[in-house]
């Protein structure tokens, strides 16, 4: 929160309230963040613990987990996002009213986690929707999620009405729904463009919070080699020993050629 004038604090103690529309508006939103009752995998167990009496999230106004996206302000993406579930996540996000926020909880929701190179796991929910706060861990403890909620409140305190995206103002306004991905021949697609291909290829995403428009590359962690799995894609060539992830090229190539098992 921005620094407050000591004279203003003294007047408030005497019952005289001096404020701005921004401060009053942000105070109302930060004090009533209603999460959506929405869990994907094991991180959701920690999210349930976060909502119990031990951590007392009622003091932040976030104890009301809503069953409908129409009544929710916050989506906590808790756990692994499979490519089959990804379109439903985007649909739920589009049904939430602005202002709406997203917390990416855990390594899987943020980057795919230990399943990053799998054929069925989305490598980060920010490929499809903007994320406000990331929570590392596998799984994160409830205290980490509580810290993420406090971090989100700090972000809300710094917002200005003339710059928020839901009023169509600012550098990159968002006034339409986010496109729902569909299944293509090699992965998730949006308008025919491959978003998260199978086989460890580079990632391209138009949505990376908070700037809404940067590109994200899947080669950041492994700049020297693009990891691919030949046993999943017959068209992949064994150009690097690490691509087979410990399997000899002969065995991997034999797996590609393996056809139906004979009855002999």
UniProtKB/Swiss-Prot annotation:
Cellular compartments annotated? Cell membrane
Q: Does the keyword Membrane apply?
A: yes
Give the binding site residues for [4Fe-4S] cluster: 42-43, 108, 138
Record's signal peptide: none
Q: Which reaction does it catalyse?
A: a quinone + NADH + 5 H(+)(in) = a quinol + NAD(+) + 4 H(+)(out)
Q: EC no.?
A: 7.1.1.-
Biological process, per Gene Ontology: aerobic respiration; electron transport coupled proton transport
Cofactor mode of binding and number, as noted: Binds 1 [4Fe-4S] cluster.
Co-factor requirement: [4Fe-4S] cluster
Tell me the membrane topology, using the record's own terms.
Peripheral membrane protein
MF terms per GO, please? 4 iron, 4 sulfur cluster binding; iron ion binding; NADH dehydrogenase (ubiquinone) activity; NADH:ubiquinone reductase (non-electrogenic) activity; quinone binding
An annotated GO cellular component of this protein is: respiratory chain complex I
For the protein in the UniProt heading, the enzyme class is translocase
Write out the entry's keywords from A to Z: 4Fe-4S, Cell membrane, Iron, Iron-sulfur, Membrane, Metal-binding, NAD, Quinone, Translocase, Transport, Ubiquinone
**Xref: HAMAP family:** NDH1_NuoB
Tell me which family the UniProt entry assigns to this protein. Belongs to the complex I 20 kDa subunit family.
Query: What's this protein's function?
Result: NDH-1 shuttles electrons from NADH, via FMN and iron-sulfur (Fe-S) centers, to quinones in the respiratory chain. The immediate electron acceptor for the enzyme in this species is believed to be ubiquinone. Couples the redox reaction to proton translocation (for every two electrons transferred, four hydrogen ions are translocated across the cytoplasmic membrane), and thus conserves the redox energy in a proton gradient.
Concerning NCBIfam families, the annotation shows: nuoB_fam, PRK06411.1, PRK14819.1
Q: How does it assemble?
A: NDH-1 is composed of 14 different subunits. Subunits NuoB, C, D, E, F, and G constitute the peripheral sector of the complex.
Q: What is this protein called?
A: NADH-quinone oxidoreductase subunit B 2
Q: Which organism is it from?
A: Chloroflexus aggregans (strain MD-66 / DSM 9485)
| The organism's taxonomic lineage, starting at the top | Bacteria, Bacillati, Chloroflexota, Chloroflexia, Chloroflexales
């Amino acid at each position: 929160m921005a620094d407050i004038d000591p004279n203003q604090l003294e007047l408030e103690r005497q019952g005289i309230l001096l404020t701005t529309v921004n401060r009053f508006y942000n105070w109302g939103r930060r004090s009533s963040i209603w999460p959506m009752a929405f869990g994907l995998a094991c991180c959701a167990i920690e999210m349930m613990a976060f909502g119990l009496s031990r951590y007392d999230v009622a003091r932040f106004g976030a104890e009301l987990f809503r069953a409908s996206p129409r009544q929710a302000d916050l989506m906590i993406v808790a756990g692994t996002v499979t490519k089959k579930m990804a379109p439903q996540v985007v649909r739920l996000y589009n049904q939430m009213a602005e202002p709406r926020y997203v917390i990416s909880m855990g390594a899987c929701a943020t980057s795919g986690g230990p399943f990053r190179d799998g054929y069925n796991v989305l490598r980060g929910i920010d490929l499809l929707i903007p994320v406000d706060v990331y929570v590392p861990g596998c799984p994160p403890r409830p205290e980490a999620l509580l810290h993420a909620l406090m971090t989100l409140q700090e972000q809300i305190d710094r917002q200005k009405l003339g710059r928020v995206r839901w009023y169509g103002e600012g550098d990159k306004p968002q006034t339409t729904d986010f496109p729902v991905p569909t299944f293509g021949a090699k992965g998730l697609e949006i308008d025919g463009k491959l978003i998260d291909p199978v086989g460890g290829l580079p990632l391209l995403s138009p949505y990376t919070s908070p700037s809404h428009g940067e590109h994200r590359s899947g080669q950041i962690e492994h700049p020297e080699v693009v990891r691919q799995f030949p046993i999943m894609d017959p068209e992949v060539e064994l150009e690097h020993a690490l691509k087979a992830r410990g399997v000899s090229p002969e065995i991997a190539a034999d797996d590609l050629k393996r056809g139906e098992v004979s009855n002999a």
